[in-house]
Amino acid sequence: MIAMNNKLAQPYAMAFLEFSLDAKQTLDTTIADLTQIKTILHDSVDLSKTLSNPLLSIKAKKEVIKAIFEPNISKNTLKFLLVLCDRGRSANLSSIIDNTIELAYKKASIEIAYVTTATAFSSNQQEALVEKLKSMTSTEQIKLNITVDKTLIGGFKVQIGSKVIDTSIQGQLRQLASHLGSSAI
């Protein structure tokens, strides 16, 4: 399902970035708008359910989008959201927004580090991780995408590009179990 969403989201993401740059909207504005939309969608389960509801008319969905987002985002970003509604893609809004943010970061030469942690990071821990990742990857700008997952027990995992760093207790236990299992044979 994720691959299909990604396949569907990619053309919309590329088209919106091209449209926003042609309309002289800065990448900073685009990223700020999309990040705000992503946060609101993540925080409001009811909004996500409303936009995914096939029984709700396109007109009603557009009214909801206008009421929530119009005062806070640029006109071009609002137009993009309304076009997605017209095309029947409001249910895929989260994946389209995620893809668009990812493309905007690439265009702005910002590397995204996906961090999964057992407990929330403080701002000092985030800054220290960014600095360490910068030195490891020779990247000038890194944006952290942090997810809290209690099943890690402790520690964290980082994926940046194709590199994965797993310092979690869950990962260490998995590695130990694998090692013990292979040496017993």
From Swiss-Prot:
Principal location class = plastid
Asked if the record carries the keyword rRNA-binding, the reply is no
Keywords for this entry?
ATP synthesis, CF(1), Chloroplast, Hydrogen ion transport, Ion transport, Membrane, Plastid, Thylakoid, Transport
Protein name from the UniProt record = ATP synthase subunit delta, chloroplastic
Assigned protein family: Belongs to the ATPase delta chain family.
**Where in or outside the cell?**
Plastid, Chloroplast thylakoid membrane
Recorded topology in the membrane:
Peripheral membrane protein
PROSITE patterns according to UniProt: ATPASE_DELTA
One GO MF term attached to the UniProt entry:
proton-transporting ATP synthase activity, rotational mechanism
What is its quaternary makeup? F-type ATPases have 2 components, F(1) - the catalytic core - and F(0) - the membrane proton channel. F(1) has five subunits: alpha(3), beta(3), gamma(1), delta(1), epsilon(1). CF(0) has four main subunits: a(1), b(1), b'(1) and c(10-14). The alpha and beta chains form an alternating ring which encloses part of the gamma chain. F(1) is attached to F(0) by a central stalk formed by the gamma and epsilon chains, while a peripheral stalk is formed by the delta, b and b' chains.
The record ties this protein, via SUPFAM superfamilies, to: N-terminal domain of the delta subunit of the F1F0-ATP synthase
